[in-house]
């Protein structure tokens, strides 16, 4: 079986005496939802950025393949890495939206890799492409804000716009780097529910980095726990207990156990598209 994500023997050193990632091996199946769990500095974000091909591993140390195509090998990016990246949606902690541009423009950026170069440079989108953007925004519940500046949205709404961008991109893999770290509990539930919904309905592989154990257990059937750049647990989230976490993390376990979401996740509304008028060049 071709895995959605294959990471083999990945090592990354930022200093001679410290490995941010230490011989990490990870396989994620298509349609699987996995939580990367760990305290601050455990290597979660570094691992996701390597999978996306934003950074390279140490020379001669590791290989990453996404959807059967190489992202990097032995510290060098693959020649066609841009093409591979077009199938990887990345949701950043700080949203990565351009505040002065409309929400719609920020979302449609997700399809730039599929457009002719001249239209990509000029940001010219056809009516059917804008329709796809509206549909994606409707799926995340913020289509009413499509033509407002992104800076007018709340943090939770901006994160949902970032998720809509991955839908327009038709990403086969979604990597979410601490997507709820700066959000209130209600917005956090909405964002995690959206990621879980996309995972179920589209069978997209989702890997989300978290530092809250209860969130990982609620939304992700599988947890990969990192500590000091090493994988210290890879298995069912339901098997994690406070005592096990204290054994794995020592005093760092309190950071993972402290933050919680207070109530059950709410259903995410999906507004209908009927009656919408679209203007496009």
Curated annotation (Swiss-Prot):
Keyword Membrane in record: yes
Alphabetical UniProt keywords: ATP-binding, Cell inner membrane, Cell membrane, Membrane, Nucleotide-binding, Phosphonate transport, Translocase, Transport
Listed GO MF terms: ABC-type phosphonate transporter activity; ATP binding; ATP hydrolysis activity
Compartment(s) of residence: Cell inner membrane
Pfam families: ABC_tran (PF00005)
GO cellular component: plasma membrane
InterPro entries: AAA+_ATPase, ABC_transporter-like_ATP-bd, ABC_transporter-like_CS, ABC_transpr_PhnC, MetN_ABC_transporter-like, P-loop_NTPase
Enzyme nomenclature, EC number: 7.3.2.2
Topology versus the membrane: Peripheral membrane protein
Highest taxon, organism lineage: Bacteria
Entries under Gene3D superfamilies matching the protein: P-loop containing nucleotide triphosphate hydrolases
CDD domains xrefs: ABC_PhnC_transporter
Reactions performed catalytically: phosphonate(out) + ATP + H2O = phosphonate(in) + ADP + phosphate + H(+)
Function: Part of the ABC transporter complex PhnCDE involved in phosphonates import. Responsible for energy coupling to the transport system.
UniProt subunit comment: The complex is composed of two ATP-binding proteins (PhnC), two transmembrane proteins (PhnE) and a solute-binding protein (PhnD).
PANTHER family hit by this protein: AMINO ACID IMPORT ATP-BINDING PROTEIN (PTHR43166), PHOSPHONATES IMPORT ATP-BINDING PROTEIN PHNC (PTHR43166:SF6)
Family from the record: Belongs to the ABC transporter superfamily. Phosphonates importer (TC 3.A.1.9.1) family.
This protein's name: Phosphonates import ATP-binding protein PhnC
